[in-house]
């Protein structure tokens, strides 16, 4: 089974990206940190997720890099012009310097916005973990996005969310040859048809109100568990990069 970047359908026409598998529609604006990314690559449009971590920085996956990126904050229905929405262009995309597009190691990227987002009930940053904070197997977390409901399914207009259980490292070590426990998180119960999928790339894995992971990759059949970039392993890089710019 080939690995499936949770943006691969993203890197085909945007209409092929869809929504969360086995989840439900989120309460509008209950996740004010969520960002919808419209990406341009070779003249075509693709999509990813992301999340606001500072008034002018969004965190996402490095494999969501494109020639230009537009960020929509404060959205629930991405096809409507909701009064809460703020559309901001990206001034600078900064993928991790050791990102490997073959193994997806260090799949993390900061996006500096061209202007500061205006804080509101629908737009506010999410907390990042403490440096020594670690998620443990059995912990319940959640992921949200405008990604895919299933293989070859249409895209979601409204934000979807799903609860996921953190799995043991052994689950993903056995499932993915390039899984790295120090910098990645394994999440999604293999007995349940619930997970993030194509189009959800770059969105946050949220545990107890804290962004602990970033949607990275999984299998192309939509089965679980999937792999998430472990944010706590990159805190010094995140802080150093935001200070630099």
Swiss-Prot record:
Residues 1-17 form the signal peptide. This is Mast cell protease 1A. It holds the Pfam family Trypsin. Its EC number is 3.4.21.-. The lineage of its organism: Eukaryota, Metazoa, Chordata, Craniata, Vertebrata. Residues 20-243 form the Peptidase S1 domain. Belongs to the peptidase S1 family. Granzyme subfamily. One of its GO terms (molecular function) is serine-type endopeptidase activity. Disulfide bonds join 48-64, 141-207, 172-186. SUPFAM superfamilies: Trypsin-like serine proteases (SSF50494). One of its GO terms (biological process) is proteolysis. Residues 18-19 form a propeptide. Has a chymotrypsin-like and trypsin-like activity. GO terms for cellular component: cytoplasm; extracellular region; intracellular membrane-bounded organelle. Mucosal mast cells. It is found in: Secreted; Cytoplasmic granule. It comes from Ovis aries. It is an enzyme of class 3 (hydrolase). It comes from the Eukaryota. SMART domains: Tryp_SPc. Keywords: Disulfide bond, Hydrolase, Protease, Secreted, Serine protease, Signal, Zymogen. The active site is at residues 63, 107, 201.
